[in-house]
Swiss-Prot record:
It is found in: Cytoplasm; Cell membrane. Disulfide bonds: none annotated. Residues 12-19 are annotated as: G1. Residues 59-62 are annotated as: G3. It is a peripheral membrane protein. NCBIfam families: era, PRK00089.1, small_GTP. It comes from the Bacteria. This is GTPase Era.
């Protein structure tokens, strides 16, 4: 039996459901999710392997008009995948009309000369007539290889989309071991899980200004727990106060919720310590961006 493999990028505007789709395919949380725009900041691989195929999905930051050096990094990181993949999934939401952001992405996709599958997500939110209208609108903009409507949240048609990708794979190598599900180290996943809880629990002004750095991560032989020390970075003193909360209540809640997810991922008991530090305007300083894991070598 021949083995097939390939790389697939997931592109689209912020908040269209790219990470939800990837997590559903993988059957576990690989990419963090929230209703805040620009939740995903780095390219994240989800490695889907069966006995006959390996599909390496690359979840990308939502493409937007950048206003900071961090925004520039995120957009370039997303577009750089067009040089690396065999197929692109261009994801759009069924419940929003095509906009300038979609048109900007379509122009880049046309220039890339890579097969593109249009994935219309969130079909659970619209009437079938609206869905058909949305599909027709996008079909007139570009010659898509396939158009697949799905609900990543409910799982509708997701397996069909994976089957379509599989059918179009070329014979190839197994690039990663069968038990490897992502390219990122555990430290990265831990930092993302802490950041996810900050996004869920804090006000609108906070999310874009937060980075999380895992300072240390090691097993304590006496307690048989993984001890993790993580620092939450913000840009202003007022943001630090919000994250700490009255009497430290918010920081404690962030840590408690993150610890549960980290324990599920690691399969170990975890002791998580968190601090909050202010690093003014870090999103516009390349050295700070590199220190916090946003490296230009990603693209």
């Amino acid at each position: 039996m021949t083995f097939k493999s390939g790389f697939v990028a997931i592109l689209g505007r912020p908040n269209v459901g790219k990470s939800t789709f990837l997590n559903h395919v993988m059957g576990q949380k690989i990419a963090i999710m929230s209703d805040k725009a620009q939740t995903t900041r780095n390219k994240i691989m989800g490695i889907y392997t069966t006995d006959k195929e390996q599909i390496v999905f690359i979840d990308t930051p939502g493409i937007h008009k950048p206003k900071t050096a961090l925004g520039d990094f995120m957009v370039e990181s997303a577009y750089s995948t067009l040089r690396e993949v065999d197929t692109v999934l261009f994801m759009v939401p069924a419940d929003e009309a095509r906009g300038k952001g979609d048109d900007m992405i379509i122009e880049r996709l046309k220039a890339a000369k890579v097969p593109v599958i249009l994935v219309v997500n969130k079909i659970d939110k619209v009437h079938p007539d609206q869905l058909l209208s949305q599909i027709d609108d996008f079909r007139n903009q570009m010659d898509f290889k396939e158009i697949v409507p799905i609900s990543a949240l409910q799982g509708n048609n997701v397996s069909r989309l994976v089957d379509i990708l599989s059918e179009n794979l070329d014979e190839g190598f197994q690039y990663f071991p069968s038990d490897q599900i992502t390219d990122h180290p555990e430290r990265f996943l831990v930092s993302e899980m802490v950041r996810e809880k900050v996004l869920h629990l804090t006000r609108e002004e906070i999310p874009h200004s937060v980075a999380v750095v895992v300072d240390s991560m090691k097993r304590d032989e006496e307690t048989d727990k993984v001890h993790i020390r993580a620092t939450i970075m913000v840009e202003r003193d007022s943001q630090k106060g919000i994250i700490i909360g009255k009497g430290g209540a918010m920081l404690k809640k962030i840590g408690s919720m993150a610890r549960r997810d980290i324990e599920l991922m690691l399969g170990d008991k975890v002791f998580l310590e968190t601090w909050v530090k202010v690093k003014k305007n870090w999103r516009d300083k390349k050295l700070d961006l590199a220190d916090f894991g946003y490296n230009e070598r990603e693209y």
